[in-house]
């Protein structure tokens, strides 16, 4: 299973701002119903783009400094940080397909390995 990292006020810069690859950040809280709907979408993103995009979650209640720094007024807020570009964000639940379209993630998609069928494998 692909790894979803958890950022704090102290490690956010390292995990997100200094990351060498793009990062999708889920700003959430345990009491937030729509945030619970976003969690499976983040898992799908992590699996689909493993090795190409990092997924990071930020608990806004435990990390108020990040909430202030990024002006998070509503949750869930999902932000896309691409090295060398301004972050983009959306508020509220979005299914995987909408997140991919909103943030232009198709360019980062990792090709699935092609498995050979038993008929196409020849023995020497």
Which functions belong to the PLM regions below?
Residues 4-23:
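A short beta-strand-turn-helix
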Residues 8, 28, 54-56:
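Conserved Rossmann-like nucleotide-binding pocket used by diverse enzymes
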Residues 20-21, 28-31, 74:
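Short pre-active-site segment immediately N-terminal to redox-active cysteine/selenocysteine motifs
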Residues 24-25, 55, 78:
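Hydrophobic beta-strand anchors of alpha/beta hydrolase catalytic cores
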Residues 34-49:
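Typically the conserved alpha-helix immediately C-terminal to a functionally engaged Cys/Sec
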Residues 58-66:
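Structural microenvironment flanking redox-active thiols in thiol-disulfide oxidoreductases
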Residues 74, 79-114:
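Non-catalytic, surface beta->alpha helical segment in thiol-disulfide oxidoreductase systems
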Residues 113-124:
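Short acidic DE-rich linear segments
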């Amino acid at each position: 299973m692909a790894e979803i990292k958890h950022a704090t006020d102290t490690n956010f810069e390292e995990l997100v701002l200094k990351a060498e690859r793009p990062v999708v950040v889920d700003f959430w809280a345990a009491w937030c119903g729509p945030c619970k709907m976003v969690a499976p979408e983040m898992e799908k993103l992590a699996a689909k783009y493993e090795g190409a995009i990092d997924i990071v979650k930020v608990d806004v209640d435990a990390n108020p400094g990040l909430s202030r720094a990024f002006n998070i007024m509503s949750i869930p807020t999902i932000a896309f940080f691409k090295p060398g570009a301004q972050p983009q964000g959306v508020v509220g639940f979005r299914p995987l397909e909408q997140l991919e379209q909103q943030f232009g993630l198709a360019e980062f998609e990792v090709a699935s390995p092609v498995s050979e069928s038993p008929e196409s494998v020849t023995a020497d």
